[in-house]
């Protein structure tokens, strides 16, 4: 089996359905004999350019270990899910289990926001 990193851009109006979507995709992976190594919810972020007249999207990063049949099934599910604006699948040499650089940035932004809120209070 190969290791993959999948980045998903979800429609911002569908943010509340993200956990259900994620569980469905994780179920597809484990049913096919794969493993989910890391799931990161990067939240809503500003887009560099507009996609389908949208300026923001909800980002997810998933690191998995799966075979080609499972990947084909996932790609098919991404294409026909209207809530998925874009998806990117990258083949990795090994499983990434630590936090990504993007997740470190998200955590740093959250810490800065809480610090500002405490300072203003």
Swiss-Prot record:
Biased composition (Basic and acidic residues): 105-115
Annotated GO biological process: translation
Protein name, per record: Small ribosomal subunit protein bS6
Source domain of life: Bacteria
The UniProt record lists the keyword Transmembrane: no
Organism: Albidiferax ferrireducens (strain ATCC BAA-621 / DSM 15236 / T118)
One GO term describing the cellular component: cytosolic small ribosomal subunit
Function: Binds together with bS18 to 16S ribosomal RNA.
Ranges where the record places region Disordered: 96-121
Entry keyword set: Ribonucleoprotein, Ribosomal protein, RNA-binding, rRNA-binding
GO-annotated molecular function: small ribosomal subunit rRNA binding; structural constituent of ribosome
Stored InterPro entries: Ribosomal_bS6 (IPR000529), Ribosomal_bS6_sf (IPR035980), Ribosomal_S6_plastid/chlpt (IPR020814), Transl_elong_EF1B/ribsomal_bS6 (IPR014717)
Species classification: Bacteria, Pseudomonadati, Pseudomonadota, Betaproteobacteria, Burkholderiales
Family note: Belongs to the bacterial ribosomal protein bS6 family.
Record has Ribonucleoprotein as a keyword: yes
